[in-house]
């Protein structure tokens, strides 16, 4: 009988190859740095220390790897067209899924990756869509007594997510993705991002690698990740993510929360001690539970795992073997 194997511990049985950040940086080869300091500063999220050195160390090698995957998919597409004796037709978008906990740096990573990929010599059209817009509106969550479960799998309109990704993969034009406001903490009614036949789509969200229970009647149930050509999980020790979440909350209290239109404006009026207590409660009762129950278990499903250290920078890379 097989013993349980920890797939994320380096061993002969692990499906991953593991690299330090320094080893990974060497795979950049001659990939050019096409971003400036000011652009990285604009793209990074509040409190994220990523700089050009981190882009050189991690992102340029990642860009080169993804270029190889995209080129391989295009070659396979052409060979399949030839095999089927088909006329030249539209190549479906290459979809990259980006997953990980809140406060771990998914949004920064996705935005920087989008800019790097769009600057390849082939100048592909790259779009970025987040799953936030696919959350049920707050009114629906309140009606179903799920506001404290916001961010958990059941708070998303998975049917809408699957219809969106199906339309993208079907090569449909002007596909609509609902927009979300972090200021109002709600879906923006009637507002959409238009995704029009990109070459590459980056789809970012905490639960994009989630699987669901199969129905007893044997009907096919597609998972979001079924539509991905490549998937990335941003990882870190939960104790570090906890610290980053609290630090971010306290910074937002001094910035975005001060806007009277902010859903969290009331927290800006609290003392520092009271605000920190609120943040701790949100972490313990919502975000930590979601991480342990729904997000962390999806980590072994990723093609690439980027693990961060205490300085919020990548210190280890795990790449799935092929």
Swiss-Prot record:
The entry's localization annotation reads: Cytoplasm
Part of which pathway?
Cofactor biosynthesis; coenzyme A biosynthesis; CoA from (R)-pantothenate: step 1/5
> Where would one find the signal peptide in this protein?
none
Q: Where does ATP bind?
A: 100-107
Kindly give the SUPFAM superfamilies that the UniProt entry links to this protein: P-loop containing nucleoside triphosphate hydrolases (SSF52540)
Describe the reaction catalysed, as an equation.
Answer: (R)-pantothenate + ATP = (R)-4'-phosphopantothenate + ADP + H(+)
Q: Which GO terms describe its biological process?
A: coenzyme A biosynthetic process
What protein does this entry describe?
Pantothenate kinase
Native species: Brucella abortus (strain 2308)
Encoding gene, per UniProt annotation = coaA
């Amino acid at each position: 009988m097989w013993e349980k194997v920890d797939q994320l511990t380096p061993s002969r049985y692990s499906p991953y190859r593991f690299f330090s950040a320094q080893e990974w940086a060497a795979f950049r080869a001659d990939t050019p740095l096409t971003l400036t300091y000011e652009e990285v500063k604009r793209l990074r999220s509040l409190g994220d220390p990523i700089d050009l050195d981190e882009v050189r160390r991690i992102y340029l090698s990642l860009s080169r790897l993804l270029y190889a995957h995209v080129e391989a998919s295009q070659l396979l597409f052409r060979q399949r067209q030839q095999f089927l004796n088909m006329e030249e037709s539209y190549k479906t978008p290459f979809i990259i899924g980006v997953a990980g906990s809140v406060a771990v740096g998914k949004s920064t990573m996705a935005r920087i990756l989008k800019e790097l990929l769009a600057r390849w010599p082939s100048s592909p059209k790259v779009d970025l869509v987040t799953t936030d817009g696919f959350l049920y509106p707050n009114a629906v969550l309140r009606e179903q007594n799920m506001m404290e479960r916001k961010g958990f799998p059941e708070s998303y309109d998975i049917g809408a997510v699957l219809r969106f990704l199906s339309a993208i993969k079907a090569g449909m034009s002007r596909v609509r993705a609902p927009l979300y406001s972090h200021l109002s903490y709600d879906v923006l009614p009637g507002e959409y991002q238009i995704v029009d036949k990109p070459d590459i789509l980056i789809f970012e969200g905490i639960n994009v690698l989630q699987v669901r229970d199969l129905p007893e009647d044997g009907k096919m149930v597609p998972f979001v990740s079924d539509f991905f050509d490549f998937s990335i999980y941003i990882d870190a020790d939960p104790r570090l993510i906890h610290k980053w979440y609290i630090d971010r909350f306290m910074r937002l209290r001094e910035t975005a929360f001060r806007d009277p239109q902010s859903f969290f404006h009331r927290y800006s009026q609290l003392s520092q001690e009271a605000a920190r207590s609120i943040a701790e409660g949100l972490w313990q009762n919502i975000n930590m539970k979601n991480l342990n129950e729904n997000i962390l278990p999806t980590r072994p499903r990723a093609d690439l795992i980027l693990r961060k250290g205490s300085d919020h920078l990548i210190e280890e890379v795990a790449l799935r073997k092929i």
